[in-house]
């Protein structure tokens, strides 16, 4: 272990609980974005973002309008994004200044469950509790919105935005091209999709489920393989080349090859 950062120890006086609710890292591991929610579930809950270097030295902190629900960071750390329960998607520059916020049509009644940014910073994706998947330009112009079959649990986007993916609580994975056309919808109504990951080119996609499975798909949405890990798969990630997939279930981290278990 290189270091730990105790966000609760850095919380202002009067905050009784601080939880990590978003985490991202840049390409070379020199910048870490952490999203915290203070006093979650209370009337005073609030969100704050930290950008740290790899020592860890805090480069900046920025408060946002509501609890943090997921965070993303571009490869060069020039673009940071966060989703919030206040119904907004936030985009920040490398100095922690909020460049823009995009409000969902329902505002606070349409919480943003998750947000991510493409590695090159050219696309921001987000998913809402009210079953919408949103793609935005760097200037917060909405390119398209997809209505999904259930609340969005996770999203992923390739480097250039040529492929994006969403996983829903209703058990569906949607794979889309850069025009918002659904290439394929893969349905597993017997479970929920909890985690999504995609490689740089969009040629390899991974999904983790509540019933303990990891699925891998190609860029056309054709399933390459699946493996059962046991407990709920809460996170997955795919490396740039698509030949390594990591997944977490319970207190265990699994490393899989891109070709399967």
Residue spans for each PLM region:
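A short beta-strand motif characteristic of beta-propeller blades
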Residues: 1-13, 57-62, 97-105, 141-146, ...
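Short glycine-/Asp-/Thr-/Trp-enriched loop segments that recur within the blades
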Residues: 10-19, 106-111, 191
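Residue-level detector of Asp-centered blade-edge/turn motifs that repeat once per structural unit
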Residues: 27-28, 75-76, 119-120, 159-160, ...
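Short glycine/acidic-enriched loop and turn motifs that connect beta-strands
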Residues: 38-43, 87-88, 131-132, 171, ...
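Short loop/turn segments that connect beta-strands within beta-propeller blades
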Residues: 52-57, 93-97, 137-141, 177-181, ...
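Blade-level signature of beta-propeller repeat domains, shared across WD40, Kelch, NHL, RCC1
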Residues: 227-261
């Amino acid at each position: 272990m290189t270091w730990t950062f105790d966000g609760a120890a850095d919380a202002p006086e009067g905050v009784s609980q601080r939880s990590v609710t978003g985490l991202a890292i840049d390409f070379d591991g020199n910048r870490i974005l952490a999203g915290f929610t203070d006093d979650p579930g209370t009337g005073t809950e609030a969100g704050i973002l930290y950008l740290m270097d790899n020592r860890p030295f805090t480069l900046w902190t920025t408060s946002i309008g509501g609890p943090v629900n997921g965070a993303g960071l571009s490869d060069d750390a020039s673009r940071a994004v966060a989703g919030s329960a206040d119904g907004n998607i936030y985009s920040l520059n490398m100095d922690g200044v909020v460049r823009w916020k995009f409000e969902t049509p329902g505002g606070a009644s349409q919480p943003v469950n998750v947000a991510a940014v493409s590695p090159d910073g050219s696309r921001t994706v987000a998913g809402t509790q009210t079953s919408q998947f949103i793609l935005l330009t760097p200037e917060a112009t909405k390119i398209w919105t997809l209505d999904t079959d259930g609340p969005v649990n996770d999203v992923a986007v390739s480097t250039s935005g040529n492929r994006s993916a969403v996983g829903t609580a209703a058990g569906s994975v949607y794979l889309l091209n850069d025009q918002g056309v659904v290439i394929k919808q893969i349905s597993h109504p017997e479970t929920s999709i909890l985690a999504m990951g995609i490689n740089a080119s969009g040629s390899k996609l991974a999904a983790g489920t509540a019933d303990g499975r990891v699925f891998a798909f190609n860029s056309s949405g054709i399933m390459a393989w699946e493996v059962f890990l046991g407990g709920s798969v809460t996170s997955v990630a795919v490396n740039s080349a698509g030949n390594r997939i990591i997944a977490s279930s319970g207190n265990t981290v699994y490393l899989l090859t891109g070709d399967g278990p």
